[in-house]
Amino acid sequence: MDAPGFTASLVAGGVAGVSVDLILFPLDTIKTRLQSPQGFNKAGGFRGIYAGVPSAAVGSFPNAAAFFLTYEYVKSLLHTDSTSHFKPVKHMLAASTGEVVACLIRVPSEVVKQRAQVSASSKTLQIFLTILSEEGIQGLYRGYKSTVLREIPFSLVQFPLWESLKALWAWRRGHVVDSWQSAVCGAFAGGFAAAVTTPLDVAKTRIMLAKAGSSTAVGNVLSAMHGVWRSQGLAGLFAGVLPRMAAISMGGFIFLGAYDQARSLLLEVGRKSP
């Protein structure tokens, strides 16, 4: 990947990430409280739905930038013909690698954000310092494995589907898709991926919110899912599925549309610069 492509992916990914995280934060808070083991009302209900937003704001730019930079770089390494049947595999590998890298940034901000979302009376900085003093750096990375195990299946569905829908639309229209068309494809791909990976998201939320030293805090995803299944059944595994689908569908529209638009503009500016 050349220098203009590097810069375009870095900046466009960051801009897209900040945009979607801040716009859709209330839906994310509602989803987190629905999945909380203490229940929606005790976790705060509809009160203080912007609790934890500083953590999201700080982490969103570097997180999204790291993902898209890795995604585009891995795609550039895995050359395939435009008609190759291996294109979906390339997109899967690129997205999976991107998630592993991005989660190194995402997980600490996610841990702080989710704890703030279910205890709106506590300040984000206070929660961050409490985690550091009581659990150390390890506490900030609690749920790293469960987050990666959620994000990789999500990306294995979302990104190949997004790329395939764009290619199909471009073929039907006879030209490369516009940014808004890319956004529509992103919304559909994101909503579908969100629905099928909700049980993994529930497990990740329970692990991040669990009390230090508890069996759930160990981070075993299957054990967390089994615990939810035993206590709440299928409804528990799909708790928050509707706000999650709504947030990620709208997020896919904003995120992938903004990314395509910003990257195209940055590359165009780069070509015009002397």
UniProtKB/Swiss-Prot annotation:
Solcar repeats lie at residues 4-77, 86-168, 177-265. GO terms for biological process: mitochondrial S-adenosyl-L-methionine transmembrane transport; S-adenosyl-L-methionine transport. GO terms for molecular function: S-adenosyl-L-methionine transmembrane transporter activity; S-adenosyl-L-methionine:S-adenosyl-L-homocysteine antiporter activity. It is found in: Mitochondrion inner membrane. It is a multi-pass membrane protein. The chain crosses the membrane at residues 5-25, 49-69, 85-105, 142-162, 182-202, 238-258. Keywords: Antiport, Membrane, Mitochondrion, Mitochondrion inner membrane, Repeat, S-adenosyl-L-methionine, Transmembrane, Transmembrane helix, Transport. GO terms for cellular component: mitochondrial inner membrane; mitochondrion. InterPro entries: Mit_carrier (IPR002067), Mitochondrial_sb/sol_carrier (IPR018108), Mt_carrier_dom_sf (IPR023395). Its main location: mitochondrion. Mitochondrial S-adenosyl-L-methionine/S-adenosyl-L-homocysteine antiporter. Mediates the exchange of cytosolic S-adenosyl-L-methionine, the predominant methyl-group donor for macromolecule methylation processes, for mitochondrial S-adenosylhomocysteine(SAH), a by-product of methylation reactions. Belongs to the mitochondrial carrier (TC 2.A.29) family. PANTHER family: S-ADENOSYLMETHIONINE MITOCHONDRIAL CARRIER PROTEIN (PTHR45667). This is Mitochondrial S-adenosylmethionine carrier protein.
